[in-house]
Structure formats: structure tokens, C-alpha cells
UniProtKB/Swiss-Prot annotation:
The keyword Transmembrane helix applies. It comes from Clavispora lusitaniae (strain ATCC 42720). It comes from the Eukaryota. It is a multi-pass membrane protein. GO terms for cellular component: membrane; mitochondrion. Keywords: Membrane, Transmembrane, Transmembrane helix. InterPro entries: AIM11. The chain crosses the membrane at residues 27-44, 77-99. This is Altered inheritance of mitochondria protein 11. The keyword Lipid biosynthesis does not apply. The gene is AIM11.
Length: 155
């Protein structure tokens, strides 16, 4: 930490909870990256082992007799799904790490602030309300506050 303070890094003054949170986000991203590397290596190995290399005088236009298209398709779908899931998780965890997001609610707040939602909300709140909307809002507030008693039994 003294080295970080020496070079004037702001993270040197961060709370231990913040440092632990950032460490957790980094570990999630690194784990997803490791899973992506292992999955891509598995996909490469499974592709190489299924590769058909004909002998010198065999035709290379038809697969061997013991070839099973169903199992090959199942392996391809499984491998593609694993690759897609691992890369997607790596992108998701990396984005959350960069944006310092740990929950879906924080993600919503961060996106709202990045897209100017708080400014638009403030502008909308500052606009004057028309008479009909104010009447409806006051009526609903009276009902919620218990100032109006609704009697549905009388006809």
C-alpha cells in the first residue's frame, strides 16, 4: 500500500470492503478466462481427434465406414455451447469488473447514469404537471393516505 500511496494511486485510500469486492470481481473474471482457455483447448483437441486423414490411395471425399454423424453432431453442439457460455461469462464478468458492478441493481444504476437517465429524470421532474394529472395524483395520494373512505357496498 505504501508503494501505491507513493505513486499517488487512489486505490491506496480505498476501504477494505472495496478492495475485497474488486478482488472478487477480478477472481470471477480470471476464472471465466481460465475456463474459456480450457474449453477452447478441449474444442481444438476434439476437432483434431475427429479429423479424417485418408491413407495414400484412399479417397478423401467420403468418411470411413465406422463414422457416426449423430455422435459427431452431439459433440459439436456440446463443444459450441461450452465455448459460447465460457466466452459470454468472460465478457460479462469483465464488463462488471471494469464498471465496478456486483449486483443487477448496481448494473441498472450504472447504465442509467451512463446513458444520462438521471438527468432526464430530473428534467422530467422539473416540468410542470397539467391539471388533470395533478387531480389524479392527488386523488391517488388521498386514497393511499387513508383520507378517502371507499364504500363499495352502497348502491
Amino acid at each position: 500500500m505504501d508503494l501505491l500511496r507513493q505513486y499517488n494511486f487512489k486505490i491506496a485510500d480505498a476501504s477494505p470492503e472495496y478492495l475485497e469486492r474488486r478482488k472478487k470481481q477480478a477472481v470471477l473474471f480470471m476464472t471465466a478466462a481460465a475456463v474459456t482457455i480450457f474449453t477452447s483447448r478441449f474444442a481444438y483437441k476434439s476437432t483434431i481427434t475427429r479429423q479424417y486423414i485418408p491413407t495414400l490411395f484412399q479417397g478423401n471425399h467420403s468418411p470411413p465406414l465406422g463414422y457416426n454423424f449423430t455422435s459427431d453432431a452431439a459433440v459439436a453442439v456440446g463443444t459450441g455451447t461450452m465455448l459460447c457460455a465460457s466466452v459470454s461469462s468472460m465478457i460479462c464478468f469483465g464488463t462488471c469488473w471494469v464498471l465496478d458492478v456486483s449486483t443487477f441493481r448496481e448494473f441498472g444504476w450504472k447504465m442509467k447514469s451512463l446513458m444520462g437517465g438521471t438527468q432526464k429524470e430530473q428534467e422530467l421532474a422539473d416540468m410542470p404537471m397539467d391539471e388533470d394529472s395533478a387531480y389524479i395524483q392527488d386523488g391517488l395520494n388521498d386514497i393511499l393516505d387513508g383520507k378517502v373512505e371507499l364504500n363499495f357496498d352502497d348502491e
